[in-house]
Amino acid sequence: MKLEEIKKFVAELRGLSQEELAKKENELKKELFDLRFQAAAGQLDQTARLNEVKKQIARVKTVQSEMK
């Protein structure tokens, strides 16, 4: 992700409620699980997507802690 995309993503997250952030986190965790499964099976072409999703999960958790 480029810096502009990251800033847009974080700004979008800050506009969500706690419940919506939790839902977004669960969606990203499910995607990460699926990506890891594909990587283990040797079917994953975009290996960089694993790190990207992990960082997105961290961003969601950061925004959640900011709201508390």
From Swiss-Prot:
It holds the Pfam family Ribosomal_L29. GO terms for biological process: translation. PROSITE patterns: RIBOSOMAL_L29. It comes from the Bacteria. InterPro entries: Ribosomal_protein_uL29, Ribosomal_uL29, Ribosomal_uL29_CS, Ribosomal_uL29_sf. One of its GO terms (molecular function) is structural constituent of ribosome. CDD domains: Ribosomal_L29_HIP (cd00427). Keywords: Ribonucleoprotein, Ribosomal protein. GO terms for cellular component: cytosolic large ribosomal subunit. Belongs to the universal ribosomal protein uL29 family. HAMAP family: Ribosomal_uL29. This is Large ribosomal subunit protein uL29. It comes from Streptococcus uberis (strain ATCC BAA-854 / 0140J). The gene is rpmC.
